[in-house]
Amino acid sequence: MSETTGAALCRSGKEENMLQLLSGSQRTVDALGFLLAFALTALMDSVFREKLPQDHGRAFAVNGELSKGKARGSGLIFVLCIALVTLAVVPLRTEYIIYTVLLIASMLSGYFDDASEVAWNEYKKGFIDLVIAIVAGVTYLNFNSTAVHFLNWSFAIPYPLYLVLIVVLIWASINVVNCTDGVDGLSASLAVVSIGTFLLAYGKELGDYATAAI
């Protein structure tokens, strides 16, 4: 690390990411990260889409046979893109790095299941998801308190109960995605909400980057 960068970190009194040091604005970094993730995902998807495993059809999904032959495992592309951008735009703290690794681990679990000639056993997939959820819960509680703040109220939840709630939330969320035909059933609405929120919160910054080459 250069003396200038080190001095900047010392003056700020807090951890900063590389892009924030270059731009000086967290809002600019957030807007840039959003655009980078979108552009990188679109580019990588167009390049590697044909190399993804093919859907074999789904026996219990509505119109599952119509999915036969479609590309599967696209999470390998967009999760890795998101992970790279995340490491570039968030402070390099151990907590955030662990979350990123767990995100990739969860994605790889689904990808290898998609790529397998024989679908994995439900108990195997559920156990992997459970381990990921437990590690995520322990990581969060190791770096954060068990206090919950709501408006003017604040109260603490016992560690064991808080851990159970985190594990249930993460484990259930992973399996809700599995029950909605992969990410297809959730991505559209989440993308619309996320994009709309970014446009409202960072309209000026996004506009500046979008028109920078004009």
Describe each region flagged by the PLM:
Residues 19-214:
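"…together with the soluble PPM/PP2C metallo-phosphatase catalytic core" -> "…together
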Residues 3-6, 10-28:
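Short, strongly hydrophobic alpha-helical membrane anchors
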